Amino acid sequence: MVEIKILKKTDDSITFILEGVDVAFANALRRTILGEVPTFAVDEVEFYENDSALFDEIIAHRLAMIPLKTPVDRFELDALELDDYTVTLSLEAEGPGIVYSGDLKSDDPDVKPANPDIPIVKLAKGQRLVFNAFAKLGRGKDHAKWQPGFTYYKYFTRIHISKEIEGWEKLKKLAKKRGLPVKENENEVIVETIKPFYIPKEFEEYEGKGIWEEIVPNTYVFVVETNGELPVEEIVKIALKILMRKADRFINELQGLAG
């Protein structure tokens, strides 16, 4: 049975334990988050004036990498086919001053820069910048600008520390200071590595003897971070739904081939 236990959640990241799946599924979830969850990003730019020190192409690249809010309730983001919808972000600015992402004016109030304080270009006195940028839905597998964030996972392990080794109390103290769950019995201390725990060099001689690591089967610690386009928990939900839809499509096609 698949279980998810949330360890920590902030506005821009979530850490959870995924239990009851093999490494193939864990990696499929990671790849789906990075490559399949759609977001809005600038895909084309029409420049009308650009007197700045930067070429059009450089500004266009900077615009493409600005995270844009992507409304979950308006678009079927877990669909295998994306909506053909374009948002126009316009700008008309004159120096002196710095042009920020918050200066972009969107024709859709729900699709706008997630962070208004990203600098785009510095304009000197008399310099002007006028353009229309066109954003559309896309997937990270086509370009990194559509990635909703970043994710990685590690095996969930337990480090067993024998009380027969000299200085075991120090390792217990270090683990607690690191914020790791610690269990203890009369023979050993057990540290659960919900995040990395590095054994000091002075204890290297005990590794494999008085100190050993147990890999918990089919259990992983996942970390997901959002760029701001989507709430972090929605990224995980959408990725899981996309995986389910792909599996359903695969099964249906197999049944069709079987006649």
UniProtKB/Swiss-Prot annotation:
Question: What is one process in the GO biological process aspect for this record?
Answer: DNA-templated transcription
Localization recorded for this chain is: Cytoplasm
In which organism is this protein found? Pyrococcus abyssi (strain GE5 / Orsay)
InterPro entries in the record, alphabetically?
A: DNA-dir_RNA_pol_30-40kDasu_CS, DNA-dir_RNA_pol_insert, DNA-dir_RNA_pol_RpoA/D/Rpb3, RBP11-like, RNAP_Rpo3/Rpb3/RPAC1, RNApol_insert_sf, Rpo3/RPB3_RNA_Pol_subunit
Q: Which UniProt keywords apply?
A: Cytoplasm, DNA-directed RNA polymerase, Nucleotidyltransferase, Transcription, Transferase
Similarity annotation: Belongs to the archaeal Rpo3/eukaryotic RPB3 RNA polymerase subunit family.
MF term (GO), any: DNA binding
What EC identifiers does the entry list? Answer: 2.7.7.6
Q: What class of enzyme is it?
A: transferase
Q: What is this protein called?
A: DNA-directed RNA polymerase subunit Rpo3
Gene label: rpo3
Keyword Transcription in annotation = yes
Record note on quaternary structure = Part of the RNA polymerase complex.
GO cellular component terms, semicolon-separated: cytoplasm; DNA-directed RNA polymerase complex
Gene3D superfamilies per UniProt: 3.30.70.3110, DNA-directed RNA polymerase, insert domain, RNA polymerase, RBP11-like subunit
Please list the reactions this protein catalyses: RNA(n) + a ribonucleoside 5'-triphosphate = RNA(n+1) + diphosphate
| Alphabetical list of Pfam families matching this protein | RNA_pol_A_bac (PF01000), RNA_pol_L (PF01193)
What role is this protein assigned?
A: DNA-dependent RNA polymerase (RNAP) catalyzes the transcription of DNA into RNA using the four ribonucleoside triphosphates as substrates.
